[in-house]
Amino acid sequence: MKLPKAQLWLILLWALVWVQSTRSACPSCGGPTLAPQGERALVLELAKQQILEGLHLTSRPRITRPLPQAALTRALRRLQPKSMVPGNREKVISFATIIDKSTSTYRSMLTFQLSPLWSHHLYHARLWLHVPPSFPGTLYLRIFRCGTTRCRGFRTFLAEHQTTSSGWHALTLPSSGLRSEDSGVVKLQLEFRPLDLNSTAAGLPRLLLDTAGQQRPFLELKIRANEPGAGRARRRTPTCEPETPLCCRRDHYVDFQELGWRDWILQPEGYQLNYCSGQCPPHLAGSPGIAASFHSAVFSLLKANNPWPAGSSCCVPTARRPLSLLYLDHNGNVVKTDVPDMVVEACGCS
């Protein structure tokens, strides 16, 4: 298992503080001697590193152009299930970031910024477009994928749609047609024309589609995500009592508002950053644990570099579960993903 460097050094530092103060044979066997404020600051820093590592980010996204509230609310309604139950897929809402309005009333160019990592795992895509109430009659739409900036020359047909009503319309697109380049840029050209024979160019509204503000076009994507440990049985360990000396689960709730991250993490409002701590007497040594877990790997590293007695046992996680997140990425896309192994549910002696 490849260890996250930031988390490794952070927990390593914390563990060394415990060892120096308690002289324990295992850094998770005793409670921290840090003051409550110092411990809380360490927990918050660990939460930041854990979230960034789980999302494969080196730094938090900077939101320079907030989405319109109505558009954001609509995206959340589409992405947020009735309950935030973790699954094995990601959902993404990507708003058109650049709209090149052609001089023709019947053509528009939409540009989306997607992650190249999504390309090979994309299995469902829909383009949402808004037809204004002022449009009369029947509208015929065709969608093309462009290979160049202005769609000159090569282009690929993706879908067509016919409607007689205003409001939002969803066009299912072939996922193979949305494979992004290394840059992640996807350009779609829309061609639309009225089918009502009584409609003339002079009598048509200036724009046949809404392409700005609350009616901004967007892509709805579903992506398969590899989730290590999917289907792992959940075993819960009661929260440690204040004076419990034995191995147990200690709970810390981290509020994203406290981290200053509520501008880009939309849901949930926080999560449980639990960890395992306590003594492991000889009769508990070797109880079921996760040999390759992050905690046990850190403690194994500590053992290898310190003269601790052979056979000492450590308190490590024995069950974890993923954390479902709704967040804004660096490109302003709304992403729903399940970060694996984020929440410790049970502890045991390794």
UniProtKB/Swiss-Prot annotation:
- Molecular function as annotated in GO: cytokine activity; growth factor activity; hormone activity
**Highest taxon above the source species:** Eukaryota
Where in or outside the cell it occurs: the entry states: Secreted
Which residues comprise the propeptide?
A: 22-236
Task: Name the GO cellular-component terms.
Answer: extracellular region
How the protein assembles, per its UniProt entry?
Homodimeric or heterodimeric through association with alpha and beta subunits, linked by one or more disulfide bonds. Inhibins are heterodimers of one alpha and one beta subunit. Activins are homo- or heterodimers of beta subunits only.
Record's protein name: Inhibin beta E chain
Organism field: Mus musculus
